[in-house]
Amino acid sequence: KMKFVNHHVAHALSSYYVSGYDHSNIVSLDGYGGSESGILAIGEGDELRVVKSVPNRNSWGHLYSEITRMLGFKSHSDEGKVMGLAAYGQHDEKEFTFIDWDRDIPLIDKKGFKKYLSGLTQRKKGEELNQRHKNLAATVQHTLEKATLQMSSYLYNMTGSKNLCVSGGCALN
C-alpha cells in the first residue's frame, strides 16, 4: 500500500524511523517543501505529531542558498562548499540584523534580508576567496546552527527528551 505524505513529514519520518529511538524530538528544515520550509515534530512509537510549522517566508534553506549564491557558488548545489569555507572564517553575531531571535522559531524578516543581499557584492567566477567571504560563510553557518539549536531547545523544553533527529536539506549543514 502506498501513502503520500507531506514533504517535511517524509523528511521527519525518514530520520526518526532509522534512529532507533522509540521517542524523539524532530527538526526538519530545507529550502521549500509544499507550503512550508520546515517542521518541528515529536515522534512517539509509530506516531508523528507536528507541533510547529516553519513557513516558506522563513526558510533557513533559502537563506543559506542565497548566501551560497552571493559567495559565487551554485545555489541548491554548492552549499557544502560554503559549510567547508566557514571553518576558515569568523562569524559575526551582528551581521544578520534581519533575524528576530525572540521567538520559538527565529524569524527572518524577508524585506530586511532582501535589503541585506542588495548591499552585498556577488563574488565573480574565478575571483579569489578573501577573508570577508570566509567570514560570511562562517556567519551563515553559525546562524543556521544557532537557529536549529533554538528550535531543538523549544522541543526539549516541551518534552524533556534529549533524543533529537534532524532532517531535510539543511541537516547536512
Where are these regions (language model features)?
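Short acidic/glycine-rich loops and adjacent helix/strand connectors
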Residues: K1-N173
